[in-house]
């Protein structure tokens, strides 16, 4: 019975690490996506772009999945009159995800 308990603890620890890693990658992805969107919106790099990126990260807490992040950026880009397609948004989100995985793996 003791071996099973230790094994369960090992699985729980691995699950926890995986969830933390997933959270870090997603948050980093959203930040990178937000910085890209800030550039599309013409926001200057630095504090303004960082502040906008934080709003994109926060948008991901509204609902599970990527739809809330895409919708937030899509709405802001449309309001600004910037021509970016849904396909371009999704491609950029995927690029940001790949970069986020790379960055988190290196940290």
Task: Annotate the PLM regions.
Residues 1-107:
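A charge-rich, low-complexity, intrinsically flexible signal that marks solvent-exposed coils, linkers
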């Amino acid at each position: 019975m003791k071996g099973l308990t230790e094994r369960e603890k090992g699985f729980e620890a691995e699950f926890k690490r995986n969830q933390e890693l997933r959270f870090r990658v997603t948050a980093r992805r959203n930040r990178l996506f937000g910085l890209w969107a800030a550039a599309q919106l013409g926001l200057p790099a630095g504090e303004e772009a960082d502040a906008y990126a934080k709003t994109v990260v926060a948008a991901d807490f509204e609902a599970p999945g990527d739809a809330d992040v895409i919708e937030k950026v899509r709405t802001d880009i449309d309001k600004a009159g910037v021509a970016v397609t849904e396909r371009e948004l999704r491609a950029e989100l995927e690029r940001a995800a790949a970069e986020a995985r790379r960055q988190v793996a290196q940290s």
